[in-house]
Swiss-Prot record:
Annotated GO MF terms: 3'-5'-RNA exonuclease activity; tRNA binding; tRNA nucleotidyltransferase activity
Catalytic activity, reaction form: tRNA(n+1) + phosphate = tRNA(n) + a ribonucleoside 5'-diphosphate
Subunit structure: Homohexameric ring arranged as a trimer of dimers.
Keyword vocabulary terms for this entry: Nucleotidyltransferase, RNA-binding, rRNA processing, Transferase, tRNA processing, tRNA-binding
Entry protein name: Ribonuclease PH
InterPro entries xref list: ExoRNase_PH_dom1, ExoRNase_PH_dom2, ExoRNase_PH_dom2_sf, PNPase/RNase_PH_dom_sf, Ribosomal_Su5_D2-typ_SF, RNase_PH, RNase_PH_bac-type, RNase_PH_CS
Lineage of source species: Bacteria, Pseudomonadati, Pseudomonadota, Gammaproteobacteria, Vibrionales
Function of the protein: Phosphorolytic 3'-5' exoribonuclease that plays an important role in tRNA 3'-end maturation. Removes nucleotide residues following the 3'-CCA terminus of tRNAs; can also add nucleotides to the ends of RNA molecules by using nucleoside diphosphates as substrates, but this may not be physiologically important. Probably plays a role in initiation of 16S rRNA degradation (leading to ribosome degradation) during starvation.
Family: Belongs to the RNase PH family.
PANTHER family hit by this protein: EXOSOME COMPLEX COMPONENT, EXOSOME COMPLEX COMPONENT RRP41
BP-aspect Gene Ontology terms: rRNA catabolic process; rRNA processing; tRNA processing
A Pfam family matched in the record: RNase_PH_C
The species this protein was found in: Vibrio atlanticus (strain LGP32)
Length: 238
């Protein structure tokens, strides 16, 4: 039995709160059950040096976790003077996922940076970050359209992500920490709102998984992401 008696294909309750902070062009608190991530999108009329003069924009991301987002305190990475490998991997994943649904040529020389800060972690922080960042980025782009700095929407659709895995021989969608820590297979799937794959990260932590099990996991991810996209659209419609 899953926590909260969820069905195997059921995602955790989602809450997306827009305009969560006062200053960012896009600000979202996204909650997947007990996992909570603050996603702030910042607009700069500037691009990295290597993009200057090309008439293209850029989307990037940063990821971090508050020291007491977990059961025991984690030391701030700033205190050690460098980011950890996991942090760098996750923020690159978030940025790639966001860029996959943006026409950078339409942006002109504008950069959007989305900061994803985990304030409470109960599994699926990177997937929650991507799903929340998509809404924050949409709000930031809408602010550019409203101000006339953009004439056309460069965002081609939503992007969302979910974790899936095999726990006790059962394929499950949207793993909580207690499930993730016991999983034989753990996978993160990122997709566009029309069901196209952006990234699949999958590892057999224990028993190797079969092709049939892979297809089961991808089917669960497809349904879960469709449910997340519905929540994203509903939040933006408010």
């Amino acid at each position: 039995m899953r926590p909260n008696d969820r069905a195997v294909d059921q995602i955790r309750p989602i809450k997306i709160t827009r305009n969560y902070t006062a200053y960012a062009e896009g600000s979202v608190l996204v909650e997947f059950g007990n996992t909570k991530v603050l996603c702030n999108a910042t607009v700069e009329e500037n691009v990295p040096r290597w993009l200057k003069g090309q008439g293209k924009g850029w989307v990037t991301a940063e990821y971090g976790m508050l020291p007491r987002a977990t059961h025991t305190r984690n030391r701030r990475e700033a205190a050690s003077g460098k980011q950890g490998g996991r942090t760098m991997e996750i923020q690159r994943l978030i940025a790639r996922s966001l860029r996959a649904v943006v026409d950078l040529k339409v942006m002109g020389e504008i950069m959007i940076t989305v900061d994803c800060d985990v304030i409470q972690a109960d599994g699926g922080t990177r997937t929650a970050s991507i799903s929340g960042a998509s809404v924050a980025m949409a709000d930031a782009i809408n602010s550019l359209l409203a101000s006339g700095k953009l004439k056309k929407n460069p965002m081609k659709g939503h992007v969302a992500a979910v974790s899936v895995g095999i726990v006790g021989a059962q394929a499950l969608c949207d793993l909580e920490y207690v499930e993730d820590s016991a999983a034989d297979t753990d996978m993160n799937v990122v997709m566009t709102e029309d069901g196209k794959m952006i990234e699949i990260q999958g590892t057999a932590e224990g028993e190797p998984f079969s092709h049939e099990e892979l297809m089961q996991l991808l089917a669960l991810a497809n349904k879960g992401i469709a449910d997340i996209v519905e929540a994203q659209k509903a939040a933006l419609a408010d």
